[in-house]
Design a protein with these regions (language model features):
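Short Pro/Gly-enriched beta-strand edge/turn motifs at strand-loop
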Residues: 9-15, 117-121, 142-144
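Short glycine/proline-enriched coil/turn segments at helix->beta-strand junctions
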Residues: 34, 57-60, 76-82, 164-166, ...
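Active-site HxH/HxHxD metal-binding segment of metal-dependent hydrolases
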Residues: 46-138, 227-237
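C-terminal regulatory/interaction regions
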Residues: 235-253
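Conserved beta-strand hairpin/beta-sheet module of binuclear metal-dependent hydrolase folds
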Residues: 3-55, 160-172, 176
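Metallo-beta-lactamase
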Residues: 37-39, 44-45, 124, 131, ...
Length: 253
């Protein structure tokens, strides 16, 4: 198996596909139902993630992205059946709103890429989704139902994926242990707070983040929500407020 990816089993029918050799330590998740499989995020695109997925399942695979930033859609080109939120459709069809060279510089930072990957030829994925997903939609995999939650803030079309029956929340870049990014021009700190308030209402048992450590306890959602609320009360929940450190996580505004 390609050594770019690290494979872990969260459950018998849930596989974590990680890119630990990159500084962002991106995680993608393969959820298998009785009829089809769902791939949440497709990573950086350094190596062909579809080869790994095909070793895991022989069922039809639908790919979704928590949001269409370059580090979450790199493998989308291998999955014609992919979905996105309508708020990010222009980013997929009209060009990504960040200079290519900035992304390339960020891509290679502190990372030894495989010799087979030519960074100079890297292109940000562009394509038309097979379907658009909206808040409240349910993806039925056969014996497993995954609910779409529109959670903007980090990105306009950011989505979390909620498996109510198991209490599993796939949080993308909304929640993880490191520095949350709410400083890009396309981020919205106020929306970020509303999204945290939304997921804080859920009976979450397991958090599956898109980056860094997998040891994320559900209580971090409440702590993040409360921190955002405090910043808003102080008039600091806005771009330009800098980096605020909360111990096991931080926020850059």
């Amino acid at each position: 198996m390609n050594d770019w990816f690290t494979i872990d089993r969260a459950e018998e029918d849930t596989t974590i596909i990680s890119e630990y050799r990159h500084w962002e330590k991106t995680h993608c998740y393969l959820l298998e139902g009785s009829e089809r499989s769902l791939l949440i995020d497709t990573g950086l695109g350094v190596c062909d993630i579809s080869e790994v997925v095909r070793e895991m399942t022989d069922k039809p695979v639908t790919a979704v992205a928590t949001h269409v930033h370059w580090d979450h859609i790199g493998g989308h080109r291998y999955f014609p059946d992919f979905c996105a939120h309508p708020a990010e459709l222009p980013w997929l069809t009209e060009g990504f709103p960040q200079p290519r060279q900035e992304i390339i510089d960020c891509f290679a930072h502190g990372c030894t890429l495989p010799k087979s990957f030519e960074l100079s030829k890297y292109e940000i994925f562009q394509g038309t989704p097979a379907r658009l997903l909206r808040d409240g939609d349910v993806i039925d995999l056969g014996g497993r139902k995954i609910q779409v939650l529109h959670t903007p803030g980090h990105a306009p079309g950011h989505m979390c994926f909620w498996e109510c029956e198991r209490g599993s929340l796939y949080t993308g870049d909304l929640v993880y242990k490191k520095t949350l990014a709410a400083y890009f021009p396309t981020t919205d700190p106020e929306e970020y707070l509303r999204s945290l308030e939304k997921i804080a209402e859920l009976p979450v048992k397991r958090v599956f983040p898109a980056h860094f450590g997998l040891d994320v306890e559900p209580d971090i959602i409440l702590r993040m929500r409360d921190a955002f609320r405090e910043l808003k009360a102080q008039g600091r929940l806005c771009h330009g407020s800098g980096v605020i450190d909360y111990g096991d996580w931080a926020l850059r505004l």
